[in-house]
């Protein structure tokens, strides 16, 4: 199996956009998830001075859902108030750049739009920076990760009918050190956000 670290994807199922986030961690596997209002958070449970291991992972508004591996979740969501998704990703990822930790961890981000078959991915690494606007494909996900994924890849997913089922499907991916997964799906008049993972 491959270790991809923080992993996220955007796609289309039954004509509706979805997004997911998968936390794989070797150094800090003891985390918990908190879903509150229009946001979801990953909270570290191990004592550390590392500022990057607790963060908002999902933030939604009326039109968009944002999924990332860090504090840039909220900044991208705020930028979407006045900017289109591509520009929001470019501006925020360029400003915040990669994480200044021992691994120079890249910042990754995904955006989906209500009622749309278009999505956006972004990546800010030490030696690589890109933002892509993508036409989503039915039953597929475009996936990027902090490690061991070259750009982004296309994956097929089994059918699901809820954000929780999506999170369970993501946990079945053959990746190392999986801790928890979040699913984001378009529901009636809102975004649904659910989490699945090992109990703490």
Label every PLM stretch briefly:
Residues 1-200:
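Conserved short alpha-helical segments that host acidic/polar catalytic motifs at enzyme active sites
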């Amino acid at each position: 199996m491959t270790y991809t670290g923080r992993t996220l994807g955007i796609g289309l199922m039954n004509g509706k956009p979805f997004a997911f986030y998968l936390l794989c961690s070797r150094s800090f596997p003891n985390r918990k998830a908190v879903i509150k209002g229009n946001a979801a958070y990953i909270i570290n449970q191990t004592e550390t001075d590392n500022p990057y291991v607790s963060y908002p992972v999902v933030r939604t508004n009326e039109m968009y859902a944002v999924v990332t591996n860090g504090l840039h979740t909220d900044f991208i969501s705020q930028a979407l108030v006045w900017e289109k998704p591509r520009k929001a990703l470019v501006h925020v990822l360029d400003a915040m750049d990669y994480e200044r930790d021992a691994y120079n961890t890249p910042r990754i981000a995904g955006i989906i739009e209500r009622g749309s078959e278009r999505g956006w991915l972004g990546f800010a690494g030490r030696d690589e920076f890109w933002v892509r606007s993508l036409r989503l494909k039915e039953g597929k996900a475009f996936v990027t990760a902090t490690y061991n994924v070259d750009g982004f890849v296309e994956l097929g997913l089994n059918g699901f009918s809820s954000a929780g089922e999506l999170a369970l499907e993501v946990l079945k991916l053959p990746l190392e050190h999986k801790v928890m997964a979040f699913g984001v799906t378009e529901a009636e008049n809102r975004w649904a956000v659910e989490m699945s993972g090992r109990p703490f």
